[in-house]
Structures are given as C-alpha cells and as structure tokens.
Design a protein with these regions (language model features):
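N-terminal accessory nucleic-acid engagement/regulatory domains that precede
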Residues: 303, 309-671
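Switch/connector loops and helix/strand junctions flanking conserved nucleotide-binding motifs
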Residues: 81-85, 121-129, 137-138, 742-745, ...
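Conserved helicase motor core of P-loop NTPases
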Residues: 694-696, 703, 808-938, 947-949
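ASCE P-loop NTPase helicase motor core
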Residues: 697-864
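N-terminal pre-P-loop "Q-motif" helix
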Residues: 683-704
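Mixed-charge (Asp/Glu-Lys/Arg
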Residues: 1-49, 55-188
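Conserved helicase C-terminal RecA-like lobe
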Residues: 930-971
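Extended low-complexity, intrinsically disordered and solenoidal helical-scaffold regions
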Residues: 186-405
Length: 971
C-alpha cells in the first residue's frame, strides 16, 4: 500500500469527543484571547470529523483587523501522559488530523493542541505542535498512533509573555507556509523525476547546439533555456531527497532537505532564484546574464546525475559561449593542470582569517574550478592585501574563514610565479564578533576559540554552509535537532543561549524593533559592521531599552529596502541580504518605485524622471501610502514636479544646498579685487598654469564661495595653498570626510601658513557649536553626501568664505550625494567656480591630449588611440621592464591580473634577493612599496613610494628598512 493510501485511510468520517476533549476546548478558548489577535472558532462536539475548528490570526490589530492567516486545529484533553527531564510524552491515538493536513485538504496550516489535566482547576497545561512538513514526514501512517514529545518550548502558559511568544511563532509558521505554498506539494516518483531531467536536458542541449552555430543570439537562446530551468531544478531536488533516503518526496520536502548539506545548497538557492523570476520573461540582455550565473548550477546538476545516477546529461554544456579571451584561456589551462598534478590531501588550516570577496568559476576540459579572492579579516584589512587561491571546491559562507593551501609554480610571460591551491577551509568567525552580538542583546559572554561550543558551531556552519540567520529561523523541530548537535555535549552554552533568545524575540516572524539589525549582523558577523551598530560616545542613544544597539539603526529597522544600515551601503550594494532578511516579495514589489528612481539616479546622475519610467500612478501611490509619518518626515516618499518624479529627500536636500550656494554668490567686493591683484604681484609665485592665476584674481570678488573642480594631478591642492597664503592672517578651517584625506591636506600645506585648524566633517556636523572661522576649505566634496552637506552649511555663517574642491568623476559618497555635480552648472558668478584641466603627472603631450579627450567624452577617442599612440600594448613580458619611476595601473585589485597578483609577478621578476616569508606574504630586498595610510606615522603619508633595502627577522616580528624620497623632518 502506498503512503498516500495509508494517509487516506486515517481520514475520518466521524469522531467522538471525550469529556476531557470538551474541557480542553473550553479552557483553550479562555486562554487564547490576546487583545484581538486570535479569534477562535472551536467546537467541542462532533461538528467537524477530522479537526476541531479553526482560529483567525490577526498579526497587529492596531493596524488592521484583517486576519493574516487561518489555522486549522485539533484539541485533545488528557490525563494520560508522562514527563521526564522536562519533556512531556503523549500518545496521539488517532492520526486522522495529521492525515487530514498531510493530504492537504486545507490550504491552511494545522496545529495540534494538547491540554493536560483539562478539568483540574489550576492544574491545566497547554502544549502545541505545528503540523509542519518535517513533522508529518516523521509519522508512520502505517501505524494507528504516534508518541509525541513536547519540550518546555512547546508549552503555552496563561501569561501575556507566553501568549506573545506564541503569536511570534505563528508569524514564523506563516512566513514558511507562504513560501512552501509556492512549491509543488504533490509527491513525485523517482522515475518521473528522471524522465523530466532527461527531457529538459535534451531541450537545453539542442538550444546550446543552435547557439554554438549562431553565438550572436546568446541572449535570445538564454531566454529559452531559462524558461525550462524550473522543471529541471524541481526534478533534481526530488532526486536529491530520494538519494538521502526519503520516500514520498514532494518539492516542499525536497527543498528543505537541500538546505542541510553544503554540496546541495546550490539547489536551494537555484530554486529561490527561479521562483523569484516565476513566469516573468527577463528583459533584453538580462537572460544572458542569468545564464552566465546558472551555468555553474547546470554543471553541478550534470555532476550530480553522473555520480549518483550514472546518467550523462548536458554533454555539450561547454559549447555555451562564456567569452573568455585567449590570455584567460591560456592562464586557466595552466592553473587547472597544476591543480590536477598536486596532492590535495587536507591539512591543518592557518591562523589568519579571511572573508570571501569574490568567487569566479572557470571551466577547463569539462571540469570546473574556482578562482577565489580572499580579503584579510581584521583591523589591518585593505584592498591591497587580498589573496587569490584556486580550488576544485567552492566556499559557501559569508563568514570569515581559515584556509589550508599548497603553493605550486606556474610560468607565464617567462616569469615563474607561485599560486595557492586550496586544500581545505573552515568557517572561523572571530569570537569577538560572537561576544559583540551577545552585547547587542545585553548579555556578557567571553567566548574564545577554545570553547567547545565555538568549535562545534564552526564545524556545523562549515559542513552545512548555513548561516546563523537561517539557523534561528529554522522550524522548531529542526532547530532543536541542530541545537542539540552543537550544544548538547558542551560544558557551556553561552552563545547557545544567545541564539535561543534571538530565535524567540528577533526571528523573521518577530515584530520587535531591532530584528532587522540583528538579522543583518547574523548574516555577516564582521567586526567592522558590528562595531558601528553599538552606541558610542558620539551617539549614545539606544534603539530600545532591551537592546544595546545604536539609535542610528532606526531607519534600517523601519524599512531596510530604502534605508542604509549605519556605516554601510546596504540599500544599494547588498540587496540580496535585505531580500533574505525580509523574505517577502510583496514588500520588495511595494518599494520598487523608490528603488527604480534610486538606481536611475546612480546610473545617470539625473534627479527627475518621467513617471512612465517608474510605474503607474497606483504603484507610486501604494508605495507612498505604505510609509509612516517618520518615513515621510525623512523624505522617503516620491514627489511629482511637472510630470516628472523623484525622491523627496533627494530633491529637497539638492535644492536647499544649491539655494544656499547661490545666496553666497550675491556678494560683491571691489576691495577684494585690489587685494587679490596686490597678492599676485608681490607673492613671488611662478604660476605654471594661467588658470590658477585667473582664479586668484577673481577670488571672492563677486562671491563668498569658490568651487574648484579637477582630476587628480591638475593642481587643486596647489591652488588651495595659494589661497591659504593669500589669507595668511585669517582664521582658517580645513575639512575632509576621512582622516586619511585630512592627513594629506596637512602634509600638502606650506609649513609657514598660520592660523590653521583641521577637522573631520562629522565632528563639525554633530557638534552643537557653529563654525567661527573666516575661511573654510572643504576637500574631496564628491564624497560628501547631501544630508551631511546640508548640515555643514547650516553650521557656517553667511559672512564666512568657503572654498570647495573635488572631482565629480572621483569616488562617490556612501549615501546620496549629487550637490557638487549640479553646483558645477548652477554656480555661474564670475570667479565662483573653476575647472582645472592641465595635468602635471606626465610630460607627454600625446597622453595629455588623450586624457583630455576621455574626460570630455570626445567622439574621436578611438581615432586618437589609433593615430597618436601607441598608448598600449598586449599584456606580456615587456611589462616587467620598468623605468625608474614607472607605475603600472591595474584596473582592479582581484584575480589573475589584479593589483595584488601582479605585484607578486613583479616580485618574482626581482631576482636580486631571496624571499622573506611572513604568514601568507613574501617580501624581497629591492621590492618597490607604497604606503597606503598614515597609521605608522604622519610622515609616511598615503601614496608615498619607497624601496625595501633590507629585511630581518626579530623574535615575533619582521623588520623592514625602507628607502623613501621625502622630507621626514617636521618643522
């Protein structure tokens, strides 16, 4: 008899309630009445044959009385139970209710309530179980009864706190239920799944064959392939569950099973992505992008079928064009050969921790390999100390890891270079991060890497690829299993208690303030992120009395889709994590108009857009209506101006800043012009650029502001020096966004300029004092966001003179900042704005001309490259023959031709010294170096070049003697 038939035979046509059952119904109705959130419709007679009615659950009756979900229930009363070590055992003698839910006669989730001693006053106790997919799969429907074990977590006490906790768990059940409802609930036989895979793979292979003959149609063919991927993923999920010993497998069960192993989580992620696409057709050019991502999943499915079912599928997958150039192919073929020829036996991992920055799969002769860029974790982490490793295994975690690797030689361009091949890796979250997460919950822990609970937790995260956020949102049965596995045999469970508290109070289903911040922290567990979330002396306010979390996290709590978490750029750069946090496609769809405008502003630099590009009136109105008073006050709503739409805060701050700047251009001072001309005549400066001389002549004559635009090397700092000398007796304030930039300003100023103060912009904007200086210099203006600039201008008096410098093509601000871009075209008063265009970092006129053409987006750039050069040559061994002061520019920091890897090639080309090793890095005498910060000394400034002339080892350190060409004596 099949499982389906076993289930059906339990579904009853008639039931009889005992006196205990009727007492249980009555008592349960009296308890479940938490302020209108649960509306019961129970029956104590034989009204329904397989269940005892239902209740409507209202998530937040203060906002809406509309039920969020109905729950079907069975209510049993009993005196027959046993209790041992806090666990209550009860025998459910009829399986009609679980069978009724398993058969899915109802679309609503089911809950079994068991009331102990229902007719004994003050002795009643309520326990409950959700009829989840995994709970039902554990029931043997060939039998007539089931022993159910209730833990203390399953008890509902007659207190407000316990009822509130029950309601939060109902929210969690609803979230899981809504996603599972998108999945197919019908069982699929193993043979049927095999047939689906064979059919879909034959279709995909035909598409790839067509594409191989006509590669220009890659996007069009990719659309057809993407359309067929849902069934392929579905069938593979089913086969994976059968392989792991499950029977009667549905898509719902198969999806849950795929989450529990690191080597099958790709199926879970694949399905989530396909369900997000659903029946929509990707826009032009986007299917191609999806296929480049899904290519790796298809390779995984092919391997899965070959290893587990001895089936050959997608044999022509390698014919799908991945657009690798010749140098890429040559390099990756050599890497693959080295990986295949070395011993990959697992080794002990090294001490250093890394974050995975980027994973790039590549394919050679039908085999898949990975190029993995790792970022050193910790306070000394920079983009300059990333490490590239190669592997046949991927790394499946957001968290910091420790690695073991083998070095092997690879020759390219006549240079033998060591590459790192991964032997093993493990999750290794810095214990201080666990302690800081505990601190956020007002708990004090001192976990270190020697704690057995830490060791067990890291092993679990490594084996499963799961993250802590997923863990605390698992269904109760699964969470209990994992918790017992990790913490069941340890002497301590300090962090286990933290996880239980977070699961109880701040899971997805929670309505408490702080859940988004804590959820994001759990997803990433990085010290630099966690530190910003804590209150400090500048921002001591907390978001809640129950959390040690900064009040600056409040916008992110309100709406993480549109507000950045403090210190990050989550709303723009980490949409994936935010979508995982919310797990609600309706919320994502609701904020789509805002996100569309935000993206368009970032892409185009424009501020106003046609409404038709954003959405219908109804879509925009729905978004605006969803905002509360606080969000509207902060300007998150969308406004319309003459048929064009934009985001209110972006528009208002832009207009306010530009109005203030224009007000400062209405001052005329003829005396100032005379003073300027006198300075130019007597200063003794030999002007190398006539533009600077003209700027000084008209400085502050018609305006109280001076905007200086120009790329690096055009002399912005030189002009600021001239202005500082001109106002020698005035009180001067120099402001920058970062400490590094401020040190650069201090270093570049003439030492004989007096009356100078230097500050970080944030220290001014968060102080209660106004700026009292005569002239204010603001550097790197393109990195200052609108809100900060609006606050800063409010601190500066109308009488002060302001010099603002920057490059609009430079690094953008973390938050929205377009004011400096628009000011270039708005501020037109004579002498109020200058763009420096002459570069002083090359003497080659041809290169200067090309540089100017590129900056101006000239239509003849291609012609100049062809006729005026050569400006470039093919990458090869000539790159290692450097002139004395030559610098090689790399387009990025990562991968085979990124800055870090190219530095290693240059080092290996240095044959004048042996290598001195220190942790994962090697150094040679004669290596050229560059200082990237002023942490060691303000004299060793950012971008100062030097050469290593001696290296020696001390007991616990390495010592470098470095030759630099700089004045190291402070006046």
């Amino acid at each position: 008899m099949k499982q389906k038939e076993h289930i059906e035979r339990h579904i009853a046509t008639h039931t009889v309630h005992s006196a205990e059952d009727r007492s249980a119904v009555s008592f349960l109705e009296s308890v479940l009445n938490p302020g209108g959130r649960i509306c019961t419709s129970f029956s104590s007679d034989d009204k329904w044959s397989n269940h005892d009615g239902f209740f409507e659950y209202v998530s937040n009756p203060d906002i809406s009385k509309s039920p969020k979900q109905n729950f079907i229930v069975q209510i049993k009363g009993t005196h027959n139970f046993s209790e041992k070590n806090g666990v209550v055992s009860y025998c459910l003698k009829s399986l009609s209710f679980p069978a009724f839910i398993a058969k899915e006669v109802t679309a609503d989730p089911g809950i079994l309530f068991v009331v102990l001693n229902p007719d004994i006053r003050e002795g009643q106790r309520i326990f409950w179980k959700a009829m989840s997919k995994s709970f039902l799969s554990d029931i043997d429907f060939e039998k007539e009864s089931k022993i159910i074990k209730f833990s203390p977590e399953d008890e509902i006490k007659n207190t407000d706190e316990s009822i509130e906790l029950f309601c939060e768990k109902l929210n969690g059940i609803i979230d899981t239920h809504l996603f599972l409802n998108k999945l197919n609930s019908d069982d699929l036989e193993q043979e049927d799944a095999l047939n689906i895979i064979e059919y879909q793979c034959n279709e995909i292979s035909c598409f790839i064959e067509d594409l191989h003959d006509s590669p220009q149609y890659r996007d069009e063919v990719s659309r057809r392939i993407v359309r067929d991927l849902n069934d392929l993923c579905y069938a593979t999920l089913i086969l994976n569950a059968y392989k792991n010993g499950y029977t009667n497998v549905s898509e719902k069960l198969a999806w849950e099973v795929s989450q529990l192993r690191v080597d099958t989580r790709y199926l879970c992620n694949f399905l989530r992505g396909l369900k997000y696409i659903n029946r929509r057709i990707p826009k032009e050019g986007q299917a191609e992008r999806l296929m480049l991502k899904y290519y790796n999943y298809l390779w995984e499915i092919r391997r899965f079928m070959r290893e587990n079912y001895n089936k050959s599928i997608l044999e022509n997958l390698e014919k799908f064009p991945l657009d690798l150039d010749t140098v890429d192919s040559e390099y990756y073929e050599k890497v693959a050969k080295q990986i295949e020829n070395i011993d990959l036996t697992k080794r002990n991992v090294r001490v250093s921790r890394y974050y995975v920055h980027k994973i790039t799969p590549f394919f050679v002769n039908g085999e898949r390999y990975y190029e993995i860029t790792l970022q050193l974790a910790g306070v000394y982490s920079t983009k300059y100390n990333r490490v590239t490793v190669y592997s046949k295994m991927t790394i499946t975690t957001y968290y910091s890891i420790q690695i073991a690797y083998t070095e092997t030689e690879l020759e390219l361009w006549g240079i033998r270079n060591n590459i790192k091949v991964l032997n093993d890796w493990k999750v290794a979250i810095d214990p201080t991060c666990l302690n800081k997460l505990s601190k956020m919950l007002m708990k004090h822990t001192k976990i270190n890497r020697n704690y057995q609970e830490y060791v067990n937790l890291m092993e679990f995260l490594t084996e499963t690829g799961m993250n802590l956020f997923e863990l605390i949102n698992m269904r109760k049965e699964r969470f209990s299993q994992i918790y017992n596995r990790v913490f069941g045999t340890t002497n301590t469970h300090d962090f286990g208690d933290v996880l239980i508290q977070i699961r109880r109070e701040y899971s997805k289903s929670s309505c408490k303030v702080g859940k988004n911040t804590i959820g994001y922290a759990m997803l990433h567990m990085r010290d630099e992120i966690l530190e910003d979330l804590l209150p400090n002396k500048f921002y001591p306010k907390r978001i809640s009395e129950k959390l040690f979390v900064s009040s600056r996290c409040y916008p992110f709590e309100k709406n993480p889709m549109i507000a950045n978490l403090v210190g990050t750029k989550t709303s723009k750069k980490d949409k994936e994590s935010i979508i995982e946090l919310l797990d609600d496609s309706k919320v994502v769809s609701l904020v789509q108009p805002y996100m569309t405008i935000d993206n368009l502003i970032s892409e185009t630099g424009e501020l106003l857009f046609k409404k038709s590009e954003i959405g219908s009136d109804a879509v925009i109105e729905n978004y605006n209506t969803s905002l509360d008073d606080w969000e509207r006050d902060k300007g998150y709503f969308i406004i319309e101006k003459e048929g064009l739409v934009t985001i209110a805060s972006y528009y208002d701050t832009t207009i306010n800043i530009l109005k203030r700047l224009l007000q400062l251009t209405h001052n005329v001072s003829l005396d100032r012009q005379e003073e300027n001309e006198r300075f130019i005549k007597n200063c003794g400066i030999k002007f190398d650029d006539i533009d600077k001389k003209i700027a000084l002549k008209h400085l502050f004559v018609n305006s109280n502001i001076m905007l200086i635009y120009g790329a690096a090397g055009t002399g912005k700092t030189t002009l600021i020096n001239y202005i500082s000398r001109m106002f020698g007796n005035a009180r001067k304030l120099y402001l920058t966004k970062t400490h590094t930039a401020l040190q650069n300003v201090i270093r570049s100023l003439d030492k004989n300029i007096d009356n100078c103060d230097f500050e970080i912009i944030d220290s001014i904007t968060r102080s209660n004092s106004a700026v009292i200086h005569d002239i204010v210099f603001i550097d790197e203006c393109s990195t200052i966001d609108n809100r900060t600039m609006e606050l800063l201008l409010g601190k500066i008096s109308n009488d002060a003179l302001i010099v603002m410098s920057g490059d609009i093509y430079q690094i953008e601000s973390i938050d929205f900042g377009n004011w400096f871009f628009y000011a270039k075209d708005i501020v037109k008063a004579k002498g109020a704005s200058i763009e420096l265009s002459s570069t002083w970092r090359t003497e080659k006129e041809e290169l200067k001309g090309l540089w100017k053409a590129v900056r101006e987006k000239s239509t003849i750039v291609t012609e100049m490259l062809s006729m005026e050069g050569p400006f470039s040559e093919n990458l090869g061994e000539n790159i290692f023959h450097l002139d004395e002061d030559e610098v090689v520019l790399c387009l990025n920091y990562d991968g085979k031709f990124g800055l870090n890897n190219m530095n290693q090639y240059f080092q290996n080309a240095n044959t004048n010294s042996k290598a001195f090793s220190w942790e994962e890095w090697s150094y040679k005498i004669g290596d050229r170096i560059i200082f990237t910060n002023t942490r060691r000394s303000t004299l060793l400034y950012n971008n100062l070049k030097g050469t290593i002339i001696n290296i020696s080892y001390a007991k616990k350190s390495i010592i470098f003697e470095i030759e630099v060409k700089a004045f190291l004596t402070e006046c």
